[in-house]
Amino acid sequence: MTRNTFRNALVAVLMVLLLGLPVFAAEHQHGDEVNDPCLGTTDKSDLEKVYPTKPPYSPYAGRNFPTRPFFGDTHLHTAFSMDAGAFGARLTPRDAYRFARGEEITSNTGQPVKLSRPLDFLVVADHSDGMGFFPLLMSGDPTLLATPQGRKWYDLIKSGKGADAAIDIIISFGRGQMPNGYPAPGTRVYRSAWQETIKAAEAYNDPGRFTAFIGYEWTSNTGGNNLHRNVIFRENGDKAGRVEPFTTLKPLGSDNPEDLWKWMAAAEEKTGSEVLAIAHNGNLSNGLMFPTIEAFGKKVDRNYAETRAKWERLYEVTQTKGTGEAHPYLSPNDEFANFELWDKGNLDGSVAKKKEMLEFEYARSAFKNGLVLEAKLGVNPYKFGLIGSSDSHTGLAAMEEDNFFGKTAPQEPSPERMTKAFFKNPKTGITVMDWEVSASGYAAVWAMENTRESIFDAMQRRETYATTGSRMFVRFFGGWDFEPKDADNRLPAAIGYGKGVPMGGDLRQAPAGKAPSFLVAALKDPIGANLDRIQIIKGWVDAKGEVHEKVYDVVWGDAGKRKPDGKTGKLPPVGSTVDVANATWTNTIGDPELITVWKDPEFDPKQRAFYYARVLEIPTPRWTAYDAKRFGTKPLPGTTMTLQERAYTSPIWYTP
């Protein structure tokens, strides 16, 4: 080989490697055939096969979008939470992760328990206030037992009245009346509990298989009004461990969410880890969760809206203490709004509910009011995605109707749990029965992979949906060019991402003459019930600043047998196969999957709007029916025995 030939060949190879293009030696630049002693003989057509310009044959090659949802729980308490421990929880964060990963363990009441299928991720979110308090109390700490409260709680627990102690602890905490010796950030006991929380997450985090997030619950509960947030770290323990959680009790903490957001900003700067906050149980806030005029004595202004929108990208819309999507008083034309409601009062039952509070407690009304605030302030503070989670205080994320292990240890399976009171406020008489506790819910996240970073990033972009316990798959896309034939494709996600935006996304100024169209699809839980219907809920604000909503049935099961009523437009019920006495049902009604393209028939391009999907399963037995069958317990009058499990997607917003 001559020196020039070798040099030209080397240049050609380097150009191919660096540019990815076929480059020919100078002496052959005017022809298609290459005949070189070093490279061999080939021609342009052969090289084009190596460097194709056409789409790949494999439809799965080069995908850059999520292909499956990951199911998990962002809100689980263990014995490290002071109220959970007082209620009888003995399971630790490590036990919680083992259970979520699919292991069989022993419950707080000595019963074997295992999930039907492992979860994909879990956040142990023990209360930041008093972390480590219960082990300290049970050890007989002299400082705590020297106080009347500490002695009272210790004696109650030791005498088998832990539930009474737990309720008294919650009430005292809500009043800011905790005893001396109470663990606070900076103390040895507190630091030890937080570090063990981090170590447990690090030990059970298994990228690609199971994600164990580091987090905690900030529990603002002043006056019994629930303003709780779960705080989650994106990064690992080496960063999260550089700070200790923010608490609510002064002087180190605050019950004002704006102070939590300030702490989050400082924590990100100090740790190098992103953090997010997820609010929950607006239904127990007595009108304080979604303010429109003022919050904590300050006006709801642009700064409030920007800050809340930055830190609170998600809202926990369903859990054991009820579902907070909608309320019949606010949505009288929605026949599915009356679902698993807790609407008697605030968290501790100290103040009864008034109807004027409801508007500021539920997600759908927050979405509507957010549109009004955006028009006024330029920012929507309530532009959040939706998830579900458990808020279980047992260490068990067991939110399955036939495998429900309650909210607290006393509500683990027993013949008595369905007929007992969950709590009763002696002053107001407000009572919530155990049967009213919901076996709900889970968070579904469309992430690229099962890692802390990927799931966190999907949460930040709001590509999430809530379920009440089912593991159905739900897709929801919005755009301007979806066509009915798109629903016939067996790979709808490729079309959805190609033509539009997914759940949690935004649509901007409408093209002339076009209305938004939506591609929505659902696939039943593999071991669950068939699907009744998919609905799209629209909310909008008109030129007068008044808000409106409408529920559309867009596709449904048994379509050949059911048609909307010609006058009301309502779809007839799907029916029911539930045998309550035997806690059984069959998939002989409904459909295993539903998909359609729907275009807004009443679109006004000048009006701000949001759209989200609600997917309903056919009726199935509630956990109370399983208890009645297995234990032979006679339900109390009014006990709900069946339900329609459901999913709520994050909205897609339209902004003109």
Locations of the language-model features?
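N-terminal secretory signal peptides that target proteins for export/translocation
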Residues: 1-7
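Bacterial N-terminal signal peptides
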Residues: 9-22
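C-terminal functional module detector
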Residues: 26-154, 183-186, 196-208, 213-227, ...
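Short, solvent-exposed helix-helix connector turns and helix-capping sites enriched
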Residues: 161-162, 253-256, 393, 451
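A conserved hydrophobic secondary-structure block that centers on an alpha-helix together
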Residues: 184-188, 203-207, 219-221, 231, ...
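Cap/lid and interdomain-hinge subdomains that line or gate substrate/regulatory clefts
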Residues: 185-193, 237, 248-278
